[in-house]
Amino acid sequence: MKIGVYPGSFDPVTNGHLDIIERASKIFDKLIVAVLVNPNKTPVFDIDERVELLKETTEHLPNVEVKAFKGLLIDFMKQENAKVIVKGLRAVSDFEYEFQMALLNKKLEPSIETIFMMTNSKYSYLSSSMVKEVARFGGCIEDLVPEKIAKKVMKKLNKKYAEMEENK
């Protein structure tokens, strides 16, 4: 069985992430979306919320699993018996960092491969940070995040939106 792992913070998941997940799910028998617990970051959505948002977003993909992990990605890969890391690239600027990480992972575990997938060009500008910024100021994020989770993301990120929803 070919198992791939697509790791990330996904705070929150964007349409760019979903684009990579859907395309990578066609390559592997099983794709694990690995949600990182990063002690150096303070996410807006806690780990359980991020896992749940991703499960909702990917429920139409039967070979996709969503799991949280902390520590080294290589250790998670071994635990899951996976051999391929999937990394999404928006622009050339993403490549340098991701290339260094791929080399480090290869050094730590020579049997692990990394594949790079370019996101659809219509999402090349998109990041979770940008989604959070737009939502905080009440902007429309419906084209930025999966439709199923847009209201939840807005509710969490925009107090005004949350108050309007509660008063309905």
UniProtKB/Swiss-Prot annotation:
Record's keyword terms, sorted: ATP-binding, Coenzyme A biosynthesis, Cytoplasm, Magnesium, Nucleotide-binding, Nucleotidyltransferase, Transferase
Marked site (Transition state stabilizer) residue numbers: 17
Cofactor: Mg(2+)
Molecular functions (GO terms): ATP binding; pantetheine-phosphate adenylyltransferase activity
Reactions it catalyzes: (R)-4'-phosphopantetheine + ATP + H(+) = 3'-dephospho-CoA + diphosphate
Gene Ontology BP terms: coenzyme A biosynthetic process
Pathway: Cofactor biosynthesis; coenzyme A biosynthesis; CoA from (R)-pantothenate: step 4/5
A GO cellular-component term linked to this record: cytoplasm
EC number in record: 2.7.7.3
Subcellular location per the Swiss-Prot or TrEMBL entry: Cytoplasm
Transmembrane parts of this sequence: none
Pfam families associated with the record: CTP_transf_like
Binding annotation for ATP: 9-10, 17, 88-90, 98, 123-129
Major location (coarse): cytoplasm
Binding-site list for substrate: 9, 41, 73, 87
Enzyme class: transferase
Function: Reversibly transfers an adenylyl group from ATP to 4'-phosphopantetheine, yielding dephospho-CoA (dPCoA) and pyrophosphate.
PANTHER family: PHOSPHOPANTETHEINE ADENYLYLTRANSFERASE
Self-association and partners: Homohexamer.
NCBIfam families: coaD_prev_kdtB (TIGR01510), cyt_tran_rel (TIGR00125)
Family note: Belongs to the bacterial CoaD family.
UniProt-recorded name of the protein: Phosphopantetheine adenylyltransferase
Species this chain originates from: Caldicellulosiruptor saccharolyticus (strain ATCC 43494 / DSM 8903 / Tp8T 6331)
